Amino acid sequence: MSHFSIAGMQLSLPCGDNLTTIGEEITKTKKRFPWVDMIVLSELLTYGPEKKYAEKLPSKAEIFYCELAKKLDIWLIPGSDYEIDGDDIFNTTSVINNQGVVIQRYRKIYPFCPYETGVSCGQDFVVFDVPQGRIGVAICYDLWFPEVARSLVCLGAEVLIYPTLTGTIDRNVELSIAEATAAMNQCYVIAVNGLGDYGNGKSIIVAPDGSVIHQAGINKEIFPVEIDFALVRRNRERGLHGLGQPLKSFRDNSISFAFATKNNRKSSELSKLGELKIPKS
């Protein structure tokens, strides 16, 4: 079988310890949709976007989610939490399998600078396997950087999952980016946003052809969907409607993208943009 079911949970929760409420919501979702294989939460849902809740891993929250995943026999991507590692704080998501084991941890590569201050950049891309195929994970603002998605896809990702927390007026731009990311990489894109003081919802699931499977509104919503990994492979092998095969073209082209190296990113042209800081009036 090539099908794998994923439910996104778009919730409104305050800053503070939300573990009990989240556990109840996950349990209710699994009871209502027993066929769901994985549940995905929004970014920083457990405690909210305050770094005073940062913990070393494995944390109380991560252990809680592991026990819940094992109890319910379900995969979990429980949004993200701030992680302390030495002198650094990372925005980190855990990937927990249905035996309750953390199989991967991903640190957000692109914190939302200059607003998400005091958060270090992750350095590693993360993909993981479920029985039906391979999934890549990134977080929120990572979506704005096509290099992240393409790197995950080159590692074999067929589904890209983005726990997200944004309440800004550019949400509709992000939805367009999600659609384009799915089409350009011939994969599913799932971006689960939060609600309340920091999130404006509009979570989205996009098919490998760039079409929107579901877009949530601005209220609490649980949205399960069945992913078909065979559809991803067919689109990549044959092209959408037998047309473009961009991943094969990317693979076979001889060009090297010099701009992607660290030195070239600091070119004179990009340096003209000035310092990365919050604009003044």
Where are each of the predicted segments found?
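Extreme N-terminal starter segment of soluble prokaryotic enzymes
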Residues: 1-8
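Short loop/turn motifs at secondary-structure junctions
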Residues: 5, 34-35, 134, 156
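Residue-level recognition of beta-strand->loop/alpha-helix junctions
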Residues: 10-12, 107, 193
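Cys-nucleophile CN-hydrolase/nitrilase-fold catalytic domain and related Cys-dependent amidase chemistry
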Residues: 13-99, 105, 167-183, 187
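Eukaryotic scaffold repeat domains enriched in small/polar residues
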Residues: 18-20, 29, 71, 121-122, ...
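CN hydrolase (nitrilase-like) catalytic-core segments centered on the catalytic cysteine
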Residues: 57-76, 144-223
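Active-site catalytic loop in hydrolytic enzyme cores
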Residues: 63, 84-158, 168-176, 180, ...
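C-terminal beta-strand edge segments of enzyme domains
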Residues: 127-129, 194-281
